[in-house]
Design a protein with these regions (language model features):
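FAD-dinucleotide binding site
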Residues: 1-2, 38, 42, 46, ...
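Active-site-proximal cap/lid insertion segments
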Residues: 11-35, 50-55, 61-210, 214-261, ...
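A short local loop/turn or secondary-structure capping micro-motif enriched for an aromatic residue
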Residues: 41-42, 232, 339-342
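C-terminal cap/loop subdomain of S1 sulfatases and analogous C-terminal strand-loop tails that border
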Residues: 3-14, 70, 219-225, 264-267, ...
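Hydrophobic "lid"/C-terminal helical patch
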Residues: 45, 49, 270
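Conserved small/polar residues in nucleotide/adenosyl-binding loops
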Residues: 347-349
């Protein structure tokens, strides 16, 4: 990382890091921390805030690994949703009628792409020990023995249910969807708790209302819509992303906006609120005029957003595509090994 006074980033696992006893690169040094990543990252954030120069403003980027694949909950949350049945998306069994090849030829379906070992965790300890090259074992072995014991107990019922062999067709897809959601949302629980910890700390030191807090993500995510998990497509479920900004001194609580915003807007927004001149060559636009006006969209605000995904062939086999989205319509061009267009109406959304 460039330009930071202090940094601590996860390493390993395709540079995503591990959930249990994770490795970090911290200011150029490799360290291993004991515990659960979501908790540890928050500990580090609070430690940084405690040690900062109290006479200067601060900017801190607090990023979590969770809930990245393969959705491994904190030990305290293992199995917490095992008796919960989540509502299925209306298009969980999407047949992609009216869409082109891209939707049909992806490799990110709950039915076919979720793996029994890495994603669904359908391996016993004995089976992992027989094949220690298994990817699930590579993270399982990082757990303390008491966490392994709890893991085994929690997932034993899932493994037994699957191995009865009664699940076929749509029933199997529905079953996989439930396991996916149980692990995904159990993993998110620790994020919720730790954001609360951080906000409580800011309140404790008297800085909560003096700090601009931005809650966002790098993209949306498919949670069963179209029968998928993951992201990449320009469809609404993953093109739309959360963006919540709290700053009571200037932003009215509860105000919302339909203004089209993009991640390139973050930097000019931060500069604007900090009273720093925005460089003329910056691509985004400050969201401050929207935020301080109770979400009302300025007359000269952008009318469309551009999107481009080009990592094909790559994991999940999502075709290369670019497109434009307005408030009412979306036009997508899939290219490279295909040449197809999709136009979608958003008016009903």
């Amino acid at each position: 990382p460039q330009g930071f006074d202090h940094w601590s980033i996860l390493s390993g696992q395709h540079e995503q890091g591990d959930y249990y006893d994770p490795d970090f690169w911290e200011n150029g040094k490799h360290i291993v921390e004991k515990g659960y990543a979501t908790d540890i990252i928050t500990d580090k954030a609070i430690e940084f805030l405690e040690g900062r120069d109290k006479n200067k403003p601060f900017c801190m980027m607090y990023h979590q690994k969770a809930p990245h694949r393969n959705w491994m909950p904190a030990p305290r949350h293992l199995g917490i949703f095992n008796n919960t049945t989540f509502p299925e998306p209306a298009n969980l069994f999407d047949d992609y009628e009216g869409r082109g090849r891209a939707a049909r030829e992806q490799d990110m379906s709950i039915e076919h792409t979720l793996t029994n070992d890495w994603d669904l965790k359908l391996l016993t300890r004995e089976e992992m020990l027989k094949d220690t090259t298994n990817r699930l074992y590579s993270v399982y072995k990082r757990m303390p023995i008491e966490v392994q014991d709890k893991w085994d107990s929690v997932y034993a019922g899932r493994i037994a249910e699957y191995r009865k062999g009664d699940l076929k067709g749509k029933s199997l897809i529905s079953w996989k969807y439930q396991q996916y959601m149980r692990d995904y949302l159990a993993t998110v629980l620790a994020v919720d708790e730790n954001i609360g910890r951080l906000l409580n700390y800011l309140e404790k030191i008297g800085e909560l209302d003096n700090t601009i807090i931005v809650y966002t993500s790098d993209q949306g995510f498919f949670l069963g819509e179209h029968g998928w998990f993951d992201k990449r497509f320009m469809y609404e479920e993953c093109q739309r992303m959360p963006l919540i900004i709290r700053y009571p001194k200037a932003i009215k609580a509860g105000s919302t906006s339909n203004a089209i915003s993009m991640n390139v807007d973050f930097a000019p927004t931060f500069l604007d609120f900090a009273g720093i001149e925005i460089p003329s060559d910056i691509q985004g636009a400050s969201l401050k005029p929207v935020l301080v006006n109770e979400g009302k969209t300025p007359a000269d605000w952008r009318k469309a957003a551009y999107y481009h995904y080009y990592e094909y062939p790559a994991e999940h086999s999502v075709k290369r595509h670019y497109g434009i989205r307005t408030q009412d319509f979306k036009l997508i061009h899939f290219y490279n090994d295909i040449d197809e267009w999709e136009m979608l109406s958003l008016i009903h959304i």
